[in-house]
UniProtKB/Swiss-Prot annotation:
GO molecular function ontology, one term from the record: 6-phosphofructokinase activity
Chain positions recorded as ATP binding sites: G11, R72, Y73, G102, D103, G104, S105
Amino-acid positions noted as binding Mg(2+) in the UniProt annotation, renumbered to this chain: D103
Cofactor(s) of this protein: Mg(2+)
Regulation of protein activity: Allosterically activated by ADP and other diphosphonucleosides, and allosterically inhibited by phosphoenolpyruvate.
Entry protein name: ATP-dependent 6-phosphofructokinase
Binding positions (ADP): R21, A22, V23, V24, R25, R154, G185, A186, D187, K213, K214, H215
Record keywords: Allosteric enzyme, ATP-binding, Cytoplasm, Glycolysis, Kinase, Magnesium, Metal-binding, Nucleotide-binding, Transferase
Length: 335
């Protein structure tokens, strides 16, 4: 394989630029030409395919976002869109593609593979909801951003003896909420993977203030409900505290990636090129126990809950490459 391309698709994630850089630099070291596909699958179909060299990626490892830009392109789910994209790839002499994105992006890579075109998937999403990898590119940065914001909110919450419901991203996965909540000593962590009762949360808030607590911090995954709706339900369940709600929003997607995300993205990008060099396609790169692994992209792209909860309060991870997490005390004070 002498000529490959790289694209980013779906929601952006810190570390995508580091992955692109690694793909380009590794490809050059392997004697391969590398092209950038701008604007994801939409750009592929439109022929926005341009050569990249070491200078193109010389100053991007520390930048958030993706310099190749990203776009959602549902038309690629249709055969017509796929064939147009492949036509453009062949026109530019591209023999393989590295796709950086979430499960929607993986579906596109899977379609390319089904048409006999080698594609490698890299997990680029802050949600950490990709099967077959312990961590996704961007997750660590998003958790760190959420942690910093929650720490600041705790300061003002303590000053006014307030309860804060803080909504974080994650789509249908509770990973950001879980990690950021534990890291900040949140009083309650509400995630889609675990059931909860409003009356229990109200009782916990009341007990905390009666014991002299100066604040109550509730970290809420967006996949459960909005912070505004959750706050309203708390009041309906009898909460009488001075309540505020905050949605952290897209700040979690931006910013310079952490060292962990930069290293993870670099390792994954280089590994993807080595696979293509060996003629391997149709797989997604992941990290398990700090080692690079490959999984069939067909299974990796399938959506579904990554967690289920046992009666004992233990998370059973449907993704076998994620560690089990004890949740028996998560709906109690972690302060």
């Amino acid at each position: 394989m002498k000529r490959i391309a790289v694209l980013t698709s779906g929601g952006d994630a810190p570390g995508m630029n580091a992955a692109i850089r690694a793909v380009v630099r590794q490809a050059i070291s392997e004697g391969m030409e590398v092209f950038g596909i701008y604007d994801g699958y939409a750009g592929m179909v439109a022929g926005e395919i341009h050569p990249l060299d070491a200078a193109s990626v010389g100053d991007i490892i520390s930048r958030g976002g993706t310099f190749l830009h990203s776009a959602r392109y549902p038309e690629f789910a249709q055969l017509e869109g796929q064939l147009k994209g492949i036509e453009q790839l062949k026109k530019h002499g591209i023999e393989g593609v590295v796709v950086i994105g979430g499960d929607g992006s993986y579906h596109g890579a899977m379609r390319l593979t089904e048409h006999g075109f080698p594609a490698i998937g890299l997990p680029g999403t802050i949600d950490n909801d990709i099967v077959g990898t312990d961590f996704t590119i961007g997750f660590d940065t998003a958790v760190t951003t959420a942690m910093d914001a929650i720490d600041k909110i705790r300061d003002t919450s303590s000053s006014h003896r307030r309860t804060f419901v803080i909504e974080v991203m994650g789509r249908n996965a509770g990973d950001i909420a879980l990690w950021a909540g534990i890291a900040t000593g949140a009083d309650e962590i509400i995630i889609p993977e675990a059931d909860f009762k409003m009356e229990d949360i109200v009782a916990s808030i009341k007990a905390g203030y009666e014991c002299g607590k100066k604040h109550n911090i509730i970290v809420l995954a967006e996949g459960v409900m909005s912070a505004a709706e959750f706050g309203q339900k708390l009041k309906e369940a009898g909460d009488t505290s001075d309540l505020r709600v905050t949605e952290l929003g897209h700040i979690q997607r931006g910013g310079s990636p952490t060292a962990r995300d930069r290293v993870l993205a670099s390792r994954m990008g280089a590994h993807a090129v080595k696979l293509l060099k060996e003629g391997i396609g149709g797989v997604a790169v992941g990290i398990r126990n700090e080692k690079m692994v490959e999984n069939p992209i067909l299974g990796t792209a399938e959506e579904g809950a990554l967690f289920s909860l046992t009666a004992e309060g233990k998370i059973v991870v449907n993704n076998p490459h994620k560690a089990d997490i004890e949740l028996s005390s998560l709906n109690k004070s972690l302060s």
